[in-house]
From Swiss-Prot:
One of its GO terms (biological process) is tRNA 5'-leader removal. This is Ribonuclease P protein component. It catalyses: Endonucleolytic cleavage of RNA, removing 5'-extranucleotides from tRNA precursor. RNaseP catalyzes the removal of the 5'-leader sequence from pre-tRNA to produce the mature 5'-terminus. It can also cleave other RNA substrates such as 4.5S RNA. The protein component plays an auxiliary but essential role in vivo by binding to the 5'-leader sequence and broadening the substrate specificity of the ribozyme. It comes from Neisseria gonorrhoeae (strain ATCC 700825 / FA 1090).
Length: 121
């Protein structure tokens, strides 16, 4: 298994983010919102992260949240379908609530909307 998080697993360009948002396939929970595309034409998933200054004013807090999400993706990317994902942090989380954020991310990425894992937006 490859646990690296190389450049090919990231959404880097504005067009990549825009194409994911254009699909309007979003699910959200308390802390996170995940948008996904129907497919990216590649053999692996890619992820983009959005953490605004409105969510957390300090850069170190925003970086911590992105680090937690990247690490979760790095460990679980082999189980994900080859789609593009954009994860937006809706509410600030820290070390005390990072476990909840990881659980929400797993529900949003793997959960089935029919079972109520994450509400369709």
């Amino acid at each position: 298994m490859d646990y690296r998080f190389g450049r090919q697993y990231r959404l880097l360009k504005t067009d990549d983010f825009s194409s994911v948002f254009a699909f309007r396939n979003r699910r959200s929970r308390d802390l996170l919102q995940v948008s996904r595309s129907n497919g990216n034409g590649l053999d692996h998933p890619r992820i983009g992260l959005v953490v605004g200054k409105k969510t957390a004013k300090r850069a170190n807090e925003r970086n911590y949240m992105k680090r937690v999400i990247r690490d979760w993706f790095r460990l679980n990317k082999n189980r994900l379908p080859p789609q593009d994902f954009v994860v937006r942090v809706r509410r600030k989380f820290d070390r005390a609530t990072a476990k909840q954020a990881r659980a929400e991310l797993a529900q949003l990425m793997f959960g089935n909307p029919a079972t109520g894992c994450g509400k369709q937006v």
